[in-house]
């Protein structure tokens, strides 16, 4: 008789995805982040669900309801901070996951890569709307500034912004719809993640060497379930350290002041995980140009596979491209730092140089270095 997990219509799908899945034997810890992202998503949905039970999406009571969660709800503070800092863990895993894909040439799986980009945009949209919900100063002004960017779109811009706001400014209608979207999007993300996995399992996983591993595969369970659990324990320990010891480390003090449309904070800035894109936006003096650069800073990932000129898929044996990759990482860290600084000299210049370098590395230098490495292989 066949094992139930191999014959049952529903359990069979789980079995083929997480138990008997043939996996390259040499994948490193960089392949842990996919499962970590799944755990982050489940954690965010669960904590978010419990927060939604006590939250009110009304401008008059939103701030008070978040305070009520922290003060009066049993373990409300831990749920709230696990949710807020869980978003940071989510983005750390996302950036690592995308970086891994670029480094080891996983972008050759076009469908998986493109669904991944859609996922990245969706998660960013969800996080942005979630940041608006506590209705503090930075929530309100962040929402105002970022939604206002759409007014740069020619002809329809102003109408589009007012349509999103549901009025002539960020107000009750905006908060209510942002809550509705913030609630529904994680489920859409879950569906997209399932499609992401579906496409990945059509081709099988990539591996650090970048060559086919069909001749050397092992079952996912128990080998990689154990390996993923180690990564999970490290991630959850880090998250709980953050939540229990310094929950406000990554937040903005301005968000502990209730939203006031008559008082603008001195430095409006988003959460840390958007700062690199925010720095690119600010480095262009023109409004429409800045918005385009902001979108392109993420959309550029879509043309990474088209710019792959090297005969080798992975960067494992390409030292020149490795140097370039780590320069890109350093550049993104610089942009993140600049995004949190005030708009004044020398930060403006540093931001502009870092933005130029960001696009230059991906669009110009990486393809050139790939070609040079091809020539070096002939010698």
From Swiss-Prot:
Binding locations of heme b b566: 97, 196
GO biological process: mitochondrial electron transport, ubiquinol to cytochrome c
Keywords, sorted A to Z: Electron transport, Heme, Iron, Membrane, Metal-binding, Mitochondrion, Mitochondrion inner membrane, Respiratory chain, Transmembrane, Transmembrane helix, Transport, Ubiquinone
Binding site for heme b b562: 83, 182
The UniProt record lists the keyword Magnesium: no
Assigned protein family: Belongs to the cytochrome b family.
Its job: Component of the ubiquinol-cytochrome c reductase complex (complex III or cytochrome b-c1 complex) that is part of the mitochondrial respiratory chain. The b-c1 complex mediates electron transfer from ubiquinol to cytochrome c. Contributes to the generation of a proton gradient across the mitochondrial membrane that is then used for ATP synthesis.
Subunit and partners: The cytochrome bc1 complex contains 11 subunits: 3 respiratory subunits (MT-CYB, CYC1 and UQCRFS1), 2 core proteins (UQCRC1 and UQCRC2) and 6 low-molecular weight proteins (UQCRH/QCR6, UQCRB/QCR7, UQCRQ/QCR8, UQCR10/QCR9, UQCR11/QCR10 and a cleavage product of UQCRFS1). This cytochrome bc1 complex then forms a dimer.
Protein name in the entry: Cytochrome b
Species the sequence originates in: Suricata suricatta
